[in-house]
């Protein structure tokens, strides 16, 4: 069960969301919350939107996953401009983006799921940064324009010796995390 507290006054708001099994993601200028409910198998198969001050019965389902083997997760892009809805099982993933300022806007599907392909997405200044295992089991880092999210261009090739674990985007640079010969590595790289 999720409850909301006003940290400036210490007051608990009347909003109570029972059955949540996820983090709460603030959207729409902190007037809405995206969350997931647990289904009968204790999996998150949905992403829902709750407007503060409205009854929970009026919450809107933003996404529902029909495949019982997949779980739904939500988060924000590093710049907090995009709600990132991901659905995945142990070997396959699919990501949709929704403007965080307008969570009722139609979602943008980055790439339709393909069995065995896992990917995650972040966005900076109209460019998507995609960590994916579509061309190499140790993942690659690709980019794509937000307006054409399926057109991936490799930025860092997949490698037998370097396992890409993650990428974090910042204003002036990005950080690549990985393993080289079993040792953790962090690389700071600049855009352009």
Language-model segment annotations:
Residues 1-192:
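Peripheral, non-catalytic segments that deliver or gate enzyme domains
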């Amino acid at each position: 069960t999720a409850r909301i507290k006003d940290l400036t006054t210490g007051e608990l708001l009347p909003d109570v969301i029972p059955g949540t099994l996820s983090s709460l993601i603030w959207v729409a200028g902190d007037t809405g919350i995206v969350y997931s409910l647990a289904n009968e198998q204790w999996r998150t198969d949905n992403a829902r939107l709750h407007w503060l001050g409205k009854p929970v019965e009026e919450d809107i389902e933003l996404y529902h996953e029909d495949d019982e083997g997949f779980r739904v997760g939500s988060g924000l892009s590093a710049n907090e401009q995009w709600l990132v809805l991901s659905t995945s099982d142990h070997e396959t993933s699919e990501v949709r983006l929704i403007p965080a300022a307008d969570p009722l806007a139609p979602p943008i599907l980055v790439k339709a799921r393909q069995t065995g392909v896992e990917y995650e997405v972040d966005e900076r200044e109209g460019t998507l940064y995609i960590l994916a295992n579509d061309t190499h089991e140790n993942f690659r880092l690709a980019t794509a324009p937000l307006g054409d999210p399926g057109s991936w261009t490799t930025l860092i090739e997949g490698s037998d010796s370097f396992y890409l674990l993650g990428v974090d985007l910042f204003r002036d640079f990005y950080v690549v995390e990985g393993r080289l010969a079993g040792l953790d590595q962090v690389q700071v790289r600049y855009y352009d």
